[in-house]
């Protein structure tokens, strides 16, 4: 079940579990103020603060994880700023035509271990891509999502990075829809030399509508708002399913707190 306000008027809530999640569409926003807002939200949280998923599109920016090696920026571009941040991982690129979902969650309240959160985020991306007829997969030891067949097999289509502070997460996942991919050629994406990066449009994603001949239509930037909301719904469904399982288990066993370190940064 979804509770939603008028179109274009977020936030709205997914109420699939005991602890609802607010989904907030922030539109296009410069990276630095969005990053600052995530940190401020997390620092100000109380045990009653609702969890949120922020949907954002950023102007062109490179972000470098807290232990990132600047050498992975192979060819700096004066038009694209580089922002050092506190997530795990190396360097990645955000820009127009990309859906970014930031997950501001109380992991202890949701009985979530960090590894379970990463797995859940990846599953939500896989489910979203499947809805647009793209086959993709995880790779052991390399967080994110990669195409599993076709001419772009092995190319990365979604990057993931998190920060855990006092048991609460921020940062999240980016999914390439239809974007200028050339800025990725100036970096070793996520620290991997030669890694191909792809978007949904160039990978041949299609959606339910059909042309005059009955053929499915290709995904373009016009579908980005729909894809963003579908990803948000998939994230909320995965989180709700985990919470339901955890609560069911607690019905027959002593509650087990999801123990989190004070701070953790996960690779992208």
From Swiss-Prot:
Keywords: Acyltransferase, Cytoplasm, Transferase. It comes from the Bacteria. It is found in: Cytoplasm. It holds the Pfam family LplA-B_cat. It is an enzyme of class 2 (transferase). It catalyses: octanoyl-[ACP] + L-lysyl-[protein] = N(6)-octanoyl-L-lysyl-[protein] + holo-[ACP] + H(+). Pathway: Protein modification; protein lipoylation via endogenous pathway; protein N(6)-(lipoyl)lysine from octanoyl-[acyl-carrier-protein]: step 1/2. Residues 47-243 form the BPL/LPL catalytic domain. Its EC number is 2.3.1.181. One of its GO terms (cellular component) is cytoplasm. Belongs to the LipB family. NCBIfam families: lipB (TIGR00214), PRK14342.1 (NF010922), PRK14343.1 (NF010923). This is Octanoyltransferase.
């Amino acid at each position: 079940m979804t509770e939603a306000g008028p179109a274009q008027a977020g936030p709205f809530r997914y109420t699939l579990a005991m602890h609802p999640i607010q989904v907030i569409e922030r539109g296009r926003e410069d990276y630095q103020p969005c990053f600052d807002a995530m940190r401020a939200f997390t620092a100000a949280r109380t045990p009653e603060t609702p969890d949120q998923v922020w949907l954002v599109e950023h102007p062109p920016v490179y972000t470098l994880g807290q232990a990132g090696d600047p050498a992975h920026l192979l060819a700096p571009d004066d038009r694209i700023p580089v922002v050092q941040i506190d997530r795990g991982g190396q360097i990645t690129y955000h820009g127009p035509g990309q859906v970014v979902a930031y997950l501001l969650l109380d992991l202890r309240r949701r009985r979530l271990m960090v590894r379970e959160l990463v797995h859940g985020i990846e599953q939500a991306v896989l489910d979203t891509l499947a809805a647009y007829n793209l086959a993709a997969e995880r790779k052991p030891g390399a967080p994110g999502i990669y195409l599993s067949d076709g001419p772009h097999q092995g190319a990365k289509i979604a990057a993931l990075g998190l920060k855990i502070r006092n048991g609460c997460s921020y940062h999240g996942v980016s999914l390439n829809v239809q974007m200028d991919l050339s800025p990725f050629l100036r970096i070793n994406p996520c620290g991997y030399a030669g890694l191909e990066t792809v978007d949904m449009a160039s990978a041949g994603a299609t959606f339910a509508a059909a042309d005059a001949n009955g053929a499915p239509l290709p995904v373009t930037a016009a579908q980005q708002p729909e894809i963003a909301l579908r990803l948000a719904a998939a994230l909320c469904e995965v989180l709700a399913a985990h919470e339901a399982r955890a609560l069911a288990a607690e019905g027959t066993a002593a509650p087990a707190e999801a123990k989190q370190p004070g701070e953790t940064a996960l690779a992208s």
